[in-house]
Amino acid sequence: MALPILLDCDPGHDDAIAIVLALASPELDVKAITSSAGNQTPEKTLRNVLRMLTLLNRTDIPVAGGAVKPLMRELIIADNVHGESGLDGPALPEPTFAPQNCTAVELMAKTLRESAEPVTIVSTGPQTNVALLLNSHPELHSKIARIVIMGGAMGLGNWTPAAEFNIYVDPEAAEIVFQSGIPVVMAGLDVTHKAQIHVEDTERFRAIGNPVSTIVAELLDFFLEYHKDEKWGFVGAPLHDPCTIAWLLKPELFTTVERWVGVETQGKYTQGMTVVDYYYLTGNKPNATVMVDVDRQGFVDLLADRLKFYA
């Protein structure tokens, strides 16, 4: 039986590819997709969800737009990474359908309420929508199997020296998620920076030759340009968000540890840092499964295999 999931995202090139991977995988049943502000403004990320589902001919999936700003802060976007549209590069179709006439939190709550079994929430942007759901619907916590997030890092940040972008945008929301008591799986930079797509991988995807694999290759062409900056020391482009979906499909590709994680919301230099108690120094019980390594080739092979679904 397929695993029911709710996808909350802020497309974003890697979010878009996470959607492609999820919808090519019969092991997953995508119940709804909600958008969050982050990689671009809330209007643009919502439009990008609709554009991707139009491309994939999955306009049957309910979509709703989420919070327009973080819980307690002004919005920061990553237009320097993802371009003016949030999905610069390929020519994507205009949406052929409209979002639901409700908020992201309302759609999430409705989906959880109507599900016969607990639902896995996959969140690949800032955690604002998920935190609002948890705060406003405590009665639905038992309907959430786990929350799989792309965010954070045990070591170096990518937006500040200490913080990864998604957590930095709304650290208060991320702290609510980690301390919710619901199982959390964290795909942080420690693993996503190892999930790099090289130029030859992009050409492999392009050679698959269907319309979706071509779009994915063109998304990666654009995404790679930002990551060519020598400061990163990358061979390719880290495909952050699809690690969440890949873990659900093939957890054996990943090395994980069980640890306590907290989020710094006040630090002068460390705001948005995920503090991972790797050496059990706090006495706190683990609240997260933290990904620390990935079989890069296995990850690339999985994506290539699933892109053939769209032939």
Curated annotation (Swiss-Prot):
Name the CDD domains for this protein. Answer: nuc_hydro_IU_UC_XIUA (cd02651)
The active site annotation covers 240
Q: How is this protein annotated for GO cellular component?
A: cytosol
Q: Which UniProt key words apply to this protein?
A: Glycosidase, Hydrolase
For this chain, one GO molecular function annotation is: uridine nucleosidase activity
UniProt function note: Hydrolyzes with equal efficiency cytidine or uridine to ribose and cytosine or uracil, respectively.
Describe the family membership recorded for this protein in Swiss-Prot or TrEMBL: Belongs to the IUNH family. RihA subfamily.
Q: What is this protein called?
A: Pyrimidine-specific ribonucleoside hydrolase RihA
State the organism of origin: Escherichia coli O157:H7
> Which gene is transcribed and translated to give this protein?
rihA
